[in-house]
Every structure is written in structure tokens, then in C-alpha cells.
Amino acid sequence: MFVLHSYSKLPNINEYAKAKSTPLDVFVWGTGSMCELGLGPSAKNKEVKRPRLNPYLTEEKLGGTKIVDFAVGGMHTLALDGKNRIWSWGGNDSEVLGRDTCQAKEVLKDIDGKNGNDDDDDDEDGDLNEAESTPALVENLPEGEIVQLAATDNLSAALLSNGDVYSWGCFRCNEGLLGFLRDEIKLQKTPLKIKELKKHCPIMRSVKIILLALDSKEWMPGVNGQQYQLGRRILERHRYRSLEPQQFGLYNIKYIASGDFHCFAIDHSHNVYAWGLNQYGQCALTGDNGELEDGSVLMKPTLIPELSHKGIKEIAAGEHHTLALTEDGQVYAWGRYDMKEIGIPKDKLPKSTFKINTGTHGSFSFLQNLFAVKIKTIGVGSHHSFAVTEDGVVYAWGFAETYGPGLGPSIDDVEKPTRIVNTATKNEDILLIGAGGQFSVSGGVKFEDEEKAEVRLDKYEDLE
């Protein structure tokens, strides 16, 4: 059993997960107006324009251990340390942090002399909630080895080595709160064992979706299916059934991935399937000339010929765009283009690029490799993207107004993959990367030999 994140390597779905053990330095950047960066309550930490080492997650602060894995949701992050503890930080309106943060909110009110009705409560220059903005331990976790984590917009989950799944938070739909488990629990504040998911694998991080597979069959629990993310139709009168795991017709599956409103699966014959929203071609299925219908949707898992048998081992999907990484280190991108999500300059777009009604380049589906160097992992936020080279250098592109790419003070969207250059990560081999709506997180290992880092720097400067 295993949990699969958007930055994970392709596993064998029949193998049991093993907890990661490599100690990581954790870096954060972007906009943290909802406490997403985990840098503490000071207002000056709301915007970080390049990767910054999180001082609360160092070996000293964690009592002689480091973070070994993390999962990034829309506005929060979960991090697993070497002592089998989960740390959380970020917005907690949906109880995704798995711990009480209400007391800190009350303290802030008392200090400021405010109440919940004051217009000044949303002052952008004020300090953040200390309990939400500072990493702290998830409460009431069970005994047992935690092997992987998952985080979405409004939900958190942890997988144990014995196959148990614990979760907390909620699911939301277009109208607001949908619930947590059937119609019985609306908000779950601390980890709860999900009995229906015993021996299920894997869990995949997405904004609104958790995908699971049992014996290589696809299952979908706890999802708003209004955009057909479930791969099946949900009638309004049975809406709470979307909060129950149900098989929906895919077999022999070895890999799954999901974006905000679309999903992918790869079977053991290397066929790739997609379903969900496709109005920007994010499912990699368009007409012969790249045309798309407004509101295009794949209502059930659909074979995607252009992606099948390409050796794809990893898929990372955002709100309306998708990246894929192949076994030989190539990266493909497709989907929405108007915020530069796919990393291809405008003058390099093929004629088949579809334009939305405004005349803006809306979607792109033709597959071409983005890099001349080998890539080892990929990651995406809602509208920005990352690729990490085999020696740990990060390239970023996409929507930059909230500094999600980590490339500095410019708020101009980044049209093509651009190398992150800063002091904090200069000597780091980045191993993991993930992102939410307006922030990003990476984890790396520092080179013992600084000369090796200098050689790497010279290599990429020569390439550029």
C-alpha cells in the first residue's frame, strides 16, 4: 500500500509503501496571506519572492530529526519527520491542520482589541494567526508507521504501513461545504480512521479529489463530482454518495494522478486514460485541429492515444493544465496557456493552439519536450509549474503575481522554464517539490562538497 503524490515516482501498485528516510531542508516561497508559508505570524513573512529555508523545520527545532516527506494542499502543508510525527501549517478554516487553532485566533482578537465584526479584521498588513502560520504537530495520530501523506484544498490524509487511512478536514462542492464522511460528519477536526479504505492504495493529492485503487481497480471516495472528476455521474439526490468509495470501471491500473477538476490513470499496458473537465484541453484530448467545445468534459475514463505508450512515469496536474514526465527524463505540458502555465513561448506555439473567445491563447495539446537536460521530478501549483533536473536544479514558469515560481520580485508571468537562482538553494540537491494556489514548497539535501555545487552552477550557466 502507498500514497502517491504529484511529485512521486511511478510505483508498482501491488507493492507496499515504505516510509521515506532522507532528511530534507525545507524551503518555502510565494504569498502566505493565509499562513501558507509556515514562517510564523509576522506580517513581513506574507510575501517571499525566492525560496527561503523554513527556520521552524530545522534539525535543531525538530529535536534532532528533519522532515523526510511532505504534501502540499491548496492553502496548507503536511510534513512528516524522521520521528514519525506530522507537522502542519496554513489556513485552517476547513480543519485541515488536524489540531486546534481557535485559541490563537481569540488571543489575536484580545491583543488587537477587536471583535469579529470589525472592518479592520481583514487588514492585509496585520500579523497572521500564530497557530496557523507556525508549524505544529497534528493531534491524536494513531500508533503505527506513517508511510505517506496527502493534502488537498480542504482535506488531509495519512497512510500507515498496515494499510489504515486516517483523514481530517472536509470536501466542498460548488455550493460550499459538502461534508466529510457520507452525511454523518460535516467537518472532521482530527485524524479519523476511514474504515472503508482499509487495504486501499494509493492516495493521490489533488485539490478536490482523492483517488484510490484496490487490487489495481480504480476507486473514488469523497469527491465533488460536479465536473465528472469521479468518472461517473452523481445525481443531486444522491450527492452524499460521492463521499463513499466506489469502483467505477478501470482495471489493471498502475498509476493515478489528478488536478483540480481532471484525472489520469495509466494501466499495465501503458494506456493512459483521462476524465473530468477538458475545456482547456487539460485532458490532452482535442479535435484534429486543436479545437475544443466550451465547457468540454470527459464524463468517464477515456483513452488518450497521444499519451499512451510514451513511457510516462509521473503526471502533475494543476487547475487547468498538466505536466507529464517520461522514464527517460522528458517533460511534456498541455492545457491552459493564458497564464503561461505550460512553459512554451508564444512564438513556439503550433498552429493547432486553440484560442478562447477573447483571442487569448487558451489551450495547447501538441506534445513536445520542454528540456534539453534530463528531469527527475515535476510539480505544479494551480497555475505555475516546476521541473527538477537530475542533479537537483529547479526550473519554474507560469503565473507569477503571487511569486509562486520563486524567481524574484517580478510579477510578470514566466513564459518559459527559468532556473531558480538564489543563495538559499545554491548548494542544495532538490528532491521534492510541490505547490498550492499561491505558494510553493521544496525539499533538498545540501551538497557536502561545495565544489560540486560550483561545478553544477557552471554547467547550467553554460547551457543558458
Swiss-Prot record:
Keywords carried by this UniProt record = Cell cycle, Cell division, Guanine-nucleotide releasing factor, Mitosis, Nucleus, Repeat
* Comp. bias regions, Acidic residues: 118-130
Q: Where are the transmembrane segments?
A: none
Q: Name one GO cellular component term.
A: chromatin
Top-level division of the source organism's lineage = Eukaryota
Gene Ontology BP terms: cell division; nucleus organization; poly(A)+ mRNA export from nucleus; protein import into nucleus; ribosomal subunit export from nucleus
The answer to whether the entry has keyword Nucleus is: yes
| Entry protein name | Protein RCC1
Record organism: Candida albicans
